[in-house]
Curated annotation (Swiss-Prot):
A single Gene Ontology CC term: ribosome
InterPro entries on file: KOW, Rib_uL2_dom2, Ribosomal_uL24, Ribosomal_uL24_CS, Ribosomal_uL24_KOW, Translation_prot_SH3-like_sf
Function: One of two assembly initiator proteins, it binds directly to the 5'-end of the 23S rRNA, where it nucleates assembly of the 50S subunit. One of the proteins that surrounds the polypeptide exit tunnel on the outside of the subunit.
GO molecular function per UniProt: rRNA binding; structural constituent of ribosome
Sequence similarity: Belongs to the universal ribosomal protein uL24 family.
Protein name, as recorded: Large ribosomal subunit protein uL24
Database matches in PANTHER family: MITOCHONDRIAL RIBOSOMAL PROTEIN L24
Subunit note: Part of the 50S ribosomal subunit.
UniProt xrefs under NCBIfam families: rplX_bact
HAMAP family the UniProt entry points to: Ribosomal_uL24_B
Pfam families named among the record's database cross-references: KOW (PF00467), ribosomal_L24 (PF17136)
Keyword field: Ribonucleoprotein, Ribosomal protein, RNA-binding, rRNA-binding
Amino acid sequence: MNIKTGDKVRVIAGKDKGKEGSVTKVFLKTDRVIVEGVNKVKKHQKPTQAEPKGGIIEKEAAIHVSNVMLLDASKKKTIRASKRESNKK
C-alpha cells in the first residue's frame, strides 16, 4: 500500500467526496485507512468503569484505499501513488 500514516489525502468517492485530512491509521490486511475528520459515524457506547458516561459518540470509520488519493502539499492537487522500481541493486 502506498499510503502511510500522516499522509495528507483527499476523498474522491462517497458521502465525504472532496474533503481532505491526514491519515491517522492504516489497516494493511483490509486495505483501509482512517482519515482525520472524515467519514464520521455515530456509535452507541455502553457505560463501563473506564468510561462511566455512556451515550452516542461520533468517531471516524475506515475508508477503502481506492476512495482516497494522496494530496501534494505544494500544489494542492491530488497525485497518483505508485511504486517505482529502480534497476540498481
